[in-house]
């Protein structure tokens, strides 16, 4: 990803065909060593292509990928009715989870980056 980002940075900066040297210079400026094999792979895949077209194709491909969420789960026939003694224990666990969750939310100063 760092090689693609560096390539895009160079291309958006006006260099229509960044070389390995250009990308290494960008990576070195932030203290990242470049792996020549990966770097050459990225350059060979992107060289001569219009960056806007590549981004548009990528967005189209990402739009077709399902992004989690609704998974249908069916319970086994015998597990539909839980035992009567387990209900209070489940309620107690939920209280503990809410308590822990509120403590964690204080750590991120209310931003909820991964919520």
Swiss-Prot record:
Modified residues (N-acetylmethionine): 1
Keyword field contains Cytoplasm: no
Low complexity bias spans: 76-90
N6-acetyllysine found at: 21
Coiled coil: none
GO BP, one annotated term: cytoplasmic translation
Gene Ontology terms, MF aspect: structural constituent of ribosome
UniProt GO cellular component terms: cytoplasm; cytosol; cytosolic large ribosomal subunit; postsynapse; presynapse; ribosome; synapse
Keywords, ordered alphabetically: Acetylation, Phosphoprotein, Ribonucleoprotein, Ribosomal protein
Residue positions, PTM Phosphoserine: 17, 19, 79, 86, 102, 105
Annotated region (Disordered), positions in chain: 76-115
Biased composition (Basic and acidic residues): 91-101
InterPro entries per UniProt: P1/P2_N_sf, Ribosomal_P1/P2, Ribosomal_P2
Residue numbers carrying N6-succinyllysine: 21
Complexes and interactors: Heterodimer with RPLP1 at the lateral ribosomal stalk of the large ribosomal subunit.
Family: Belongs to the eukaryotic ribosomal protein P1/P2 family.
PANTHER family in UniProt: 60S ACIDIC RIBOSOMAL PROTEIN FAMILY MEMBER, LARGE RIBOSOMAL SUBUNIT PROTEIN P2
Role, per record: Plays an important role in the elongation step of protein synthesis.
UniProt name for this protein: Large ribosomal subunit protein P2
Originating species: Mus musculus (Mouse)
Lineage: Eukaryota, Metazoa, Chordata, Craniata, Vertebrata
